[in-house]
Amino acid sequence: MINVTFLAHSGFLVDDGKRCYVFDYYKDPNNIVWQLAKRGRELWFFVSHVHADHFNPSITEFDGPQTRYICHQDVPLEGKVKKCITMRPGHDATLDDVSIHMYGSTDEGGSFYVKTNTANIDSDSIFHAGDLNWWHWLGDTPENNADAKRMAWREFKELDGLSVDVAMFPVDNRLEDAMEWGAIEFLRRVEVKKVFIPMHLNGPLWTPSVYFKALFGDVPVWEPQKEGDECTF
């Protein structure tokens, strides 16, 4: 069983009962992470890249014996906290009983695949996309959008055959009619067993299109309605 709490924007807290994985902490208006820190919970912060809506330097305030930081190599945290590792796309890390792989991005940084217990084949796996997406902007030039598609296909190809329990992926309103394109291509390649969670909305809540539902009607989707919402899977 795994509990997921939406912090804000692309920020999530995933609690597997043993430790709490905090992805792309940007803000936490409900002070959920602080409450867990005060209770002595083990906190692992994952930072996909340096954009201000994915990385808040204040996460150093959580540093302590129960805290780890796993960051893309461009995130300036090394030397500022006690336990920090940096990664780049294509690299693996094993910390305690947790295995981590950093996949690529179509913007800055990378994306994270986390297996929560390497000793248990049935343990939960988590994918957080960071800014990995098909960034097709309707007002952009054909050349730029062709480049965006090539970049997306290159990174999505690395995900072919991946199976995850929980996936968090951008569905950005600013892309207008193209807002689902990245999610659709992601789900064509990746099996999501427990839940697909849209993030990075930059606008109203997402209503899956008829086309999306026709393709992936069997994929469980949870869309948080507000900051602080949580669900157990």
Model-inferred region functions:
Residues 108-189:
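Active-site-proximal loop/helix segments of hydrolase catalytic cores
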Residues 32-93:
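Active-site HxH/HxHxD metal-binding segment of metal-dependent hydrolases
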Residues 28-31, 50-55, 75-79, 91-93, ...:
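Active-site environment of divalent metal-dependent phosphoester hydrolases
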Residues 11-50, 57-61, 132-161:
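Pre-active-site segment of Zn-dependent metallo-hydrolases
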Residues 67-123, 218-233:
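Metallo-beta-lactamase
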Residues 22-26, 41-55, 70-74, 127-131, ...:
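Active-site neighborhood of phospho(di)ester-bond hydrolases with catalytic His/Asp-centered motifs
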Residues 4-10, 80-95, 158, 179-233:
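Binuclear metal-ion centers of metallo-dependent hydrolases, dominated by the metallo-beta-lactamase
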Residues 3-6, 21-24, 98-105, 123-131, ...:
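Active-site-proximal beta-strand elements of phosphoester/diester hydrolases
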